[in-house]
Amino acid sequence: MKLNKMFLVGALLSLGFASCSKEGNGPAPDSSSTADTHMSVSMSLPQHNRAGDNDYNPIGEYGGVDKINDLTVYVVGDGKIDVRKLSTADLQVNQGASTTSIVTAPFQVKSGEKTVYAIVNITPKVEAALNAATNAADLKVAYEAAYAAFSDAGSEIATLVNNQDQMIMSGKPVVQTILPNVSAANASVQNKVPIIVKRAAIRASMTITQQPVNGAYEIKALRPGNVEVVIATVSDLKWSVAQYEKKYYLQQKDNALSPAASFVPASTNDYNGANGAMKHYDYSQLANRITVHQLNAPYSVTDVPNVAYKYVSETTHADNDYRKGNTTYILVKGKLKPVAAMWADGEQAAYQEGGDLFLGLVTGKFYANEANANAANPASGGAGNPRVVTYKAAAVYYYAWLNPNTLDPTTWTMSPARRNNIYNVNISKFRNIGLSGNPFVPTDPDPNNPDTPDNPDTPDPEDPDTPNPEEPLPVQKTYMVVDVTVTPWTLHNYDIEF
């Protein structure tokens, strides 16, 4: 399979912030009797990700539309924790095409060395954990801890509110010496504390630039001599996303590894079961599908505001540890319709729209009648199940990784899904008939386990193309041409043919 086109857009935002004097939850701030100076805090999401985040051919940036509710600052020093939570009434928020700034007035503090933490849109769970800290060491532990990404209602890392992204944002704390006797007027120059933060979540989306014919997309197989032959059509394309982390680190690790980075399934048994993938990854959005967005030109930054998306959490591993069963994927579901030449004799006339389709692996033909398919496609050697793949209700499936690292799918080794990025997967061409179901949903031998993800799209066990979760990412057969775009919130461009 040839890699044709893939776009990745790394997402970033810029915030400028200076705090005002306001008490928040937790220990009381320094009183005016002990405060001897003023300071301000400047918060920013960088215009470019750090090295490693901004790889894979950047081609642009997207400023984003963020909903800022509050900003919480923790100033640690002299054995005290000064907590200040500032609502929108205390903030001047300016959102531009590429940056967002948040500005507050300087506030009074005691001079000396301080460690400053800042969180935008803090969630109740995170706030409770940080405010429970009574000393610098406990606060550091709480700030570096992992929290539920989406399962705690009201404490999700990202929600869509009035077409705006409401996301928790955080970054590395800054250690800085606060100078004494600095007035409020001079605080932004002499006692300004710069903090870089990132959005904790990722945005995933899907588009298609292949043009439909009579409402459906032609699947064009390549024959000898690079001749394209239409073998079927696919319509009613909808997508979902899964296998992203259930937890996230409030403070991103220096190596950007996520909480379950060490989970590397070595077998299907490792993938399944209560201690397998279901323990670490979220599959809850598989049934909540979005229609694939049609484009008439290559995906670009200008399309970002108009394309529907889903939020996912950071999901990464060491470079050599990516497997099909631990990597975030987008799943596409469509309705398959073979062309006349792909039907066995008499079967097309007998087929009723929406019924099951049966593909014979011996004849290479489709059947409307299962018994006819089984008879014409016996098991190898006459023993076992007939060599027939069932496409239930004519449904067909394709999957794609969010952020593969090379231009050739046969050499993929990793697909890191990093926070503060927008990943768009664009389908530019279908080459092959897809899978009979979704192969990447873990199961549990215990039927009473309530945590077992629901997989309404179980693949046919006879489908020879169904991959195993312990396999590395490279694939030898592919099904569609995909453009993956990651948008700073930095745009990256890849060509991939599936």
UniProtKB/Swiss-Prot annotation:
Residues 436-476 are annotated as: Disordered. It comes from the Bacteria. GO terms for biological process: cell-cell adhesion. The record marks R50, A51 as: Cleavage. A lipid is attached at C20 (S-diacylglycerol cysteine). Residues 1-19 form the signal peptide. It is found in: Fimbrium; Cell outer membrane. GO terms for cellular component: cell outer membrane; outer membrane; pilus shaft. Gene3D superfamilies: 2.60.40.2580, 2.60.40.3690. Residues 20-50 form a propeptide. InterPro entries: Mfa1_C, Mfa1_fim. The keyword Signal applies. Keywords: Cell outer membrane, Fimbrium, Lipoprotein, Membrane, Palmitate, Signal, Virulence. A lipid is attached at C20 (N-palmitoyl cysteine). PROSITE patterns: PROKAR_LIPOPROTEIN. Belongs to the bacteroidetes fimbrillin superfamily. FimA/Mfa1 family. Structural component of the fimbrial stalk. Minor fimbriae are composed of a structural subunit, such as the 53 kDa fimbrillin, and the accessory subunits Mfa3, Mfa4 and Mfa5. Fimbrium assembly occurs by linear, head-to-tail oligomerization of fimbrial subunits. This is mediated via insertion of a C-terminal beta-strand from one subunit into a groove in the N-terminal domain of the following subunit. NCBIfam families: fim_Mfa1_fam. Structural subunit of the minor fimbriae. These filamentous pili are attached to the cell surface; they mediate biofilm formation, adhesion onto host cells and onto other bacteria that are part of the oral microbiome. They play an important role in invasion of periodontal tissues and are recognized as major virulence factors. Mfa1 orthologs from different strains have highly divergent sequences, and this correlates with pathogenicity. This is Minor fimbrium subunit Mfa1. It comes from Porphyromonas gingivalis. The lineage of its organism: Bacteria, Pseudomonadati, Bacteroidota, Bacteroidia, Bacteroidales.
